[in-house]
Amino acid sequence: MNLSVAIVDIIGIPYDGTTLEKRGLGGSESAVILMSKELTKLGFSVTVFNNCVDDAKPGIYDGVSYRNVKDIPDNEQFDVVISSRTVFPFVPKQLQNMINFDASAFSFMRTHAKLKIVWMHDTFCAGDHILENLVVNGFIDELFTLS
């Protein structure tokens, strides 16, 4: 049985699995593309939810499914959910007044994931003022940081 991984990038610029071949791209977005490919090669089922608009199209690229972040499913379960550069997908309803973002679309995803990870690429993390609270109270399981 292969594990399903959702990578959520709600603050990145538009991209899909072919963007690196067509134009320059930020390091965080490039990392999502490249890591997704590698995880797929290792046998994981990977879905990237990001801004698939303009020249970035939803579809399957190198075995990775790219879907528009606005189409977050309300009944699809992922074993691992990785949020790139923000805690927003993991903020429970009772804490959403602390952020300027409606995270209700992520409710099913966050409550059914076996492992919830924030992948920090930059010097900031959207929602960093509640990051510690979310980790201490079990809403986020792991933090990945780049040096």
Protein language model regions, located:
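N-terminal subdomain of nucleotide-sugar transferases
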Residues: 1-51
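Soluble or luminal CAZymes and related metallo-dependent hydrolases
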Residues: 27-31, 82, 146
